[in-house]
């Protein structure tokens, strides 16, 4: 008999078991482990909740990827799954077969179910199955570890949604034996009180990405700093909208000192995004010097950088290996750009993405950074649109990109000579100027995706972040 035949028989046996729920529950301890996933899917689909509850207690794999089955929250099924786990946690001695360590609520492991489904099992060799079982059967060592529940948290409302509220309450009830692990936490509009409750529930070491879009209340800033300092594995920090109030110098210094002390504890931070946060103005040096590890990404956008802030950027080793730099909407019109040139020279070997969108950079300031920009040989994305730039300035800029052969996306403003008195593009004027710019560019290198003018093409509506069928989108026409 072939390997496929007994596999199919096992599936049929599992389906027949579900017709007799009492029998299915009674034989779970003797059920072959390879039958658990297809039987679980069948029970999930047919909503045999009591079977699911008992199957969780006998689950023979380290991870139960429930999130890839449950595309939308189902509180009834969640209650039964959690009840099954609670029954086990209440036992001093766990069953022999139970290996569950992780309840995965993110939609990240659909491959698990397809591998163990009939279609994929038919194509699996006995050797491959044996190898997979060997890896998953590795015994745990040491003391009993807490069960980990993995889920991402995106807070778009003032209050918690039902599934997050359910897990939060369960974790608080089972504190110590269950950890709520969230690699990504995003807060758009949740109130301070509810957000504090979330941060107190989530296991802080699990958070790798934290985005706060409403840092407008001073009390939130202070509260946030206290929790942030516990997130030792944080890799990405995004904070936005901290400019609602005019602060006294004492309050500003207090907030900067608070954040500085937090940054000292974030040893794994790699990406720092600061958007529309004005209390850093004039104090950026104090923050940058507290970074413990080299950053890969630095974004200071919609801010009001002072010249002293820009001067500090090339000084510190933590910014010497940048891959992404974004100073868009940074009002650089009245700031000397020699420090930016020094920073670009420092990161020329590593920089891959540079955003200088709508920074008020005219030709005189552009000339300051062009020599350094031309040495950024690994640059793949360069966005410069939104600046008031003449035709001569754009010609000079394009000629300086001759050695940037890795550029795959570049955006530039329409030349000033193609605009009306309200700053709107006149296509009849832009078309010949654009053709001339492309001719100059092709003399030094062959571009891939390039935009001149507004970010969205007025002819085809394409934005620079979309995949284009043609090599170029020059107002909807291949160049």
Swiss-Prot record:
GO terms assigned for molecular function: ubiquitin-like ligase-substrate adaptor activity
Gene3D superfamilies on file: Ribonuclease Inhibitor
Keyword Protease: no
Organism superkingdom: Eukaryota
Cellular-component GO terms for this entry: Cul2-RING ubiquitin ligase complex; cytoplasm
InterPro entries assigned to the protein according to its UniProt record, in alphabetical order: LRR_dom_sf, PRAME, PRAME_domain
Repeat in keyword set: yes
Record-level GO BP terms: negative regulation of apoptotic process; negative regulation of cell differentiation; negative regulation of DNA-templated transcription; positive regulation of cell population proliferation; proteasome-mediated ubiquitin-dependent protein catabolic process
Ranges: LRR repeats: 15-38, 97-124, 179-203, 204-230, 231-265, 266-291, 292-323, 324-342, 348-375, 376-400
Keywords, alphabetical: Leucine-rich repeat, Repeat
Family classification: Belongs to the PRAME family.
Protein name: PRAME family member 18
Native source organism of the sequence: Homo sapiens (Human)
Species classification: Eukaryota, Metazoa, Chordata, Craniata, Vertebrata
Gene: PRAMEF18
